[in-house]
Amino acid sequence: NRRSFNDAVDTMVRQAALTGDRAVTLIMADIDHFKQVNDFNGHNTGDRLLQECAKRITGCLPSQALVSRIGGDEFAVAVEFDRNRADRIDGIAASLVEAIAQSATINAISIEVTASIGLARSDSLARGGTLPDSRTLLEMADIAMYHSKRQGRNSYFWFEAPMADEMRFRNELEYGIRKGVARGEFVPFYEQQIDLQTGELTGFE
């Protein structure tokens, strides 16, 4: 479950830091448009698709990696790596994107599936000798994952601080709009659409 995964990640981060040259990457993978698969094909098909995706994810990982399904269509992965060979993690992430994107045939139904993936590394989030805990890594990887979705899905991105600022701005903007609508602070204005041939009013925008 999620708690045992978090505990295992915290242990992995501490042990990696002791070596001085190793760190941990937290990878979040979200299956794109999974709700549509459930809605159109039923929960049984959706569950089998998740099982297939879990198999594909595991097949791309080194044996010591930690894997957990932490949400309806979200998987979390923790991988220890050599800090001087971070490119290997890029290779894993690219393999995950490619493996998940293979069409799946379930209950005689062909399903096109992709994933949005976000990554965060423990060494880049350490502050003043304090290591990030699993919750922080999950949060940062989650932010990077949603950035991937906004960039068109079926891709992966490493967490960068501006992503958090952008998400915070979006959340504050959405909250402000919802509050404004409830208070009646928005006044709509409509521009007339005129047929240039006849001069008649045809609509508004």
How does the language model describe each region?
Residues 1-25, 32-62, 68-72, 76-77, ...:
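Conserved long alpha-helical elements within nucleotide-processing catalytic cores of c-di-GMP signaling
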